[in-house]
Amino acid sequence: MAPTLATAHRRRWWMACTAVLENLLFSAVLLGWGSLLIMLKSEGFYSYLCTKPENVTNSTVGGSAEPEPEELSLVNGWLSCKAQDEILNLAFTVGSFLLSAITLPLGIIMDKYGPRKLRLLGSACFAVSCLLIAYGASNPDSLSVLIFIALALNGFGGMCMTFTSLTLPNMFGDLRSTFIALMIGSYASSAVTFPGIKLIYDAGASFIGILVVWAGCSGLVFFNCFFNWPLEPFPGPEDMDYSVKIKFSWLGFDHKITGKQFYKQVTTVGRRLSVGSSMRTAKEQAALQEGHKLCLSTVDLEVKCQPDAAAAPSFMHSVFSPLLVLSLVTMCVTQLRLIFYMGAMNSILEFLVRGDQKTVALYTSIFGALQLLCLLTAPVIGYIMDWKLKECEDTSEEPEEKEGTQGEKKQKRDRQIQKVTNAMRAFAFTNVLLVGFGVTCLIPNLPLQIFSFVLHTIVRGFIHSAVGGLYAAVYPSTQFGSLTGLQSLVSALFALLQQPLYLAMMGPLGGDPLWVNVGLLAMSMLGFCLPLYLICYRRQLERQLQQKREDSKLFLKINGSSNREAFV
């Protein structure tokens, strides 16, 4: 039942559009935890932990019993208290941490087995999580513990759908970074899903009914994946052209090859047949000049015409590359800055308004609504990553021979250098916005915090899109999931520092976030290390390209032709 890669390529626009919608409704919905928390309290989850003393109503007149009504309150007829808040937040902490920690094995599995099975599993887990929450709401006094399992499944299923959607942009060629940014933007904007559901809930809809319908919609995701997603992983645009698919039984081997593999192998056969018998003794020298082994038969053609090992670095080589290490530093610093603000936002607003809960609720709602900006702003960074790639040439392929006019025409940009240049601009721009966000956080002005909300939302969409675009541009497509999972795991572990920072702000600093924000602003300067390294890396690539062109000119001058293979 699974379609082929060629069929999936024809359906790529349908798959991309539905993936954006599915990410918006089913991926990182746990980021809207504040709205879900209110609904869980209204349904009585862990309300049994709140015990109302018998003498509360009789002693509220006395001064000694005044704190009691502040600790116990009624939400939709259910008791709410501090113990309930703590246990529900513990459930959220467990679910969100498992969500981040599982990204690395999830990426490795996806790179090995492809996205189809993981997406089917993720949609099923999300549906089960909705049904578990609904079942727990039917009898919260006995089934509240199900919220732990439900949130873990919710986060796991959402991350499965997010990760698998990041492979779809491989089918869009030079627009790959733009589509990666669109997928990440829809993932980041999914924080508005629970606030939207809360509006339906406040309008009078049944909480259990909403969750059952939501689980049914997740079932539609399952069937969409079942009928449209192929078994094979999506290769990168540099690895395959989906428009060519031929069975080469007449060449002596029966497997199917596509795209550049087709071009490489047929071109090699043509060159082999065009070489005279006097040239055959020098075949090894010709192979060295060409940069890959010359195949002498259909058996050699099938076995030996493989990409050079240097062209596809190993996973460990990619992990210890300076580019990945600096991207991890940038991501860790940015994640800590963003997550601390999300966790401490209510406390920061309370400090600014001196405890006015209505104002805090208003600004919290504004912050939640602004999360949709991620869907609009994330593709901007993807467009920066894809800037002028269509005007570039791929130096990994042999240039076509141009007689007479080669020196007159302006040389095209090198694709790899343009990718590095675009990534440098994207990370520099993102870090400037991050520093600007840190500066606005230092100013104790309430209306200015709306501008901080906007910067926070933009940076959150930009940083994920920039990292995803960088990994897709620099590293092999078969390592994309593993490297993205490693980045998510490391940044999630580093982001755990937000808890001691929050305790320091609420304890010794008396709720004043000034010094914590100063420290985080200073740490944000580390984010400029990556664009500075990319500048040096670009210069290195430019020197290599210049040397290659000089060698090509020298060879042309000696032999009178740009075709090296004619002079073995």
UniProtKB/Swiss-Prot annotation:
Record's function text: Uniporter that mediates the transport of the stereospecific L-phenylalanine, L-methionine and L-branched-chain amino acids, between the extracellular space and the cytoplasm and may control the transepithelial (re)absorption of neutral amino acid in kidney and small intestine. Transport activity is mediated through facilitated diffusion and is sodium ions-, chloride ions- and pH-independent.
Keyword GTP-binding assigned: no
GO biological processes: isoleucine transport; L-amino acid transport; L-leucine transport; methionine transport; negative regulation of L-leucine import across plasma membrane; phenylalanine transport
GO MF annotation terms: L-amino acid transmembrane transporter activity; L-isoleucine transmembrane transporter activity; L-leucine transmembrane transporter activity; L-methionine transmembrane transporter activity; L-phenylalanine transmembrane transporter activity
Stated name of the protein: Large neutral amino acids transporter small subunit 4
Annotated region (Disordered), positions in chain: 395-415
SUPFAM superfamilies attached to this UniProt entry: MFS general substrate transporter (SSF103473)
Summary of the knockout phenotype: Homozygous knockout fetuses mice for SLC43A2 display a reduced intrauterine growth not leading to a prenatal lethality. In addition, fetuses mice show a marked reduction in the concentration of almost all amino acids in the amniotic fluid. Pups show growth defect, metabolic alterations and early postnatal lethality.
Subcellular location: Cell membrane; Basolateral cell membrane
Pfam family, one: MFS_1
